[in-house]
Amino acid sequence: KELSSKRKNCSEEFCRRVKQELAFLNMPGIEFVVELERVPLYSMGCDRMQFLVSANRGEPAKPMSKIASGGELSRIMLGVKTVLSGSNLGKTMIFDEIDTGISGSAAQKVGLKLKEAAANRQVLCVTHSAQIAALGNHHFLIKKEVREGRTFTGVYPLDFEGRKRELARMISGVKVTDLTLKSAEEMLALAGFSNESS
């Protein structure tokens, strides 16, 4: 019962902080609630917890797993992990394709939030977003290759020129142009990286 009481007391502040993070991540009107349901005592206490969300004003909050889109789910989990990161839950945060369903300013803000998190711990992020990749301290290209009828996955660290070229490819798709290379170089400069700093 003491654990249950502490969970209840902490949940309001936790929700307030998660909503604050989500507002920064372009989700200002989201409703985020921790639902604690009383269950028979088991190894984790006497509560079952789930996150309820409503991304649309006027709609009731429902289980996150049932209503959040890919982009919403990615940003919600980033918000939750950001709030929990202060509780010393681990030295590494991993995000796989956190850019799903987002673009533009939302991707930029996700990248900034990841960079902020990386100040205190290791953050690994798989992304297809140039805005997010440009903000990373290190950039690796992950590439599948078929050799002798078998598929291999290679991981290649990129220097400044490699980053610029890969960001340009991420921006333009197949054909890299002088304009996309210039855009990629500008993205890296805005993130604080230059050819001299690599």
Describe the predicted segments one by one:
Residues S87-N88, T100-Q108:
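Conserved D-loop-proximal element of ABC-family nucleotide-binding domains
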Residues A55-G58, L73-M93, A117:
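GG-anchored amphipathic helix commonly corresponding to the ABC/SMC/Rad50 NBD signature/C-loop
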Residues D96-E97:
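Walker B catalytic acidic pair
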Residues K1-P40:
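Charged, surface-exposed helical/loop "interaction arms" that form contiguous linear patches used
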Residues S105-S198:
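C-terminal lobe/lid and adjacent interdomain/linker elements of RecA-like ASCE P-loop ATPase modules
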